[in-house]
């Protein structure tokens, strides 16, 4: 089942729920020292739980910008597939594109786009439309 970001009547495709969970798990373990939502409460708390309200989008975008900057400091091998079970690895292992140079560009959606860019675009669209952004299944 496909998961993505819903903004009003717009859909921003991500991929599988496991893949999106990996993105948030990587943030938790690598940038929040295993304390989910402690550093990035809007992204990790509110959005991950399903919805980031319109009034919190500016703060969410600031957090996302910091996440991208911080993830540049980690190699692709530092990816976390599941914060609850650190023994799990991505199904593709280390077989990744040479275009992926660090964790800031590791996460690519099922339609080939950079996940952080897609999320930023969705959040900006939500700001423009004055609505919330939700994680939803297609």
Q: Where do the PLM segments sit?
A:
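Acidic (Asp/Glu-rich) sequence patches and key acidic residues
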Residues: 1-121, 125-138
């Amino acid at each position: 089942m496909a998961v993505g970001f819903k903004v009003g009547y717009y859909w921003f495709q991500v991929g599988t729920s496991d893949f999106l969970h990996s993105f948030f798990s990587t943030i938790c373990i690598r940038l929040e020292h295993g304390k989910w939502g402690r550093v990035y409460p809007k992204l990790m708390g509110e959005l991950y739980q399903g919805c980031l309200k319109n009034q919190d989008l500016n703060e969410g975008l600031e957090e996302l910008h910091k996440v991208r900057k911080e993830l540049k400091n980690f190699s692709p091998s530092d990816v976390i597939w599941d914060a609850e079970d650190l023994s799990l690895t991505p199904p593709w292992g280390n077989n990744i594109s040479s275009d992926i140079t660090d964790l800031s560009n590791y996460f690519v959606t099922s339609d080939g786009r950079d996940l952080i860019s897609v999320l930023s675009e969705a959040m900006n669209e939500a700001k423009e439309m004055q609505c919330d952004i939700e994680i939803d299944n297609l």
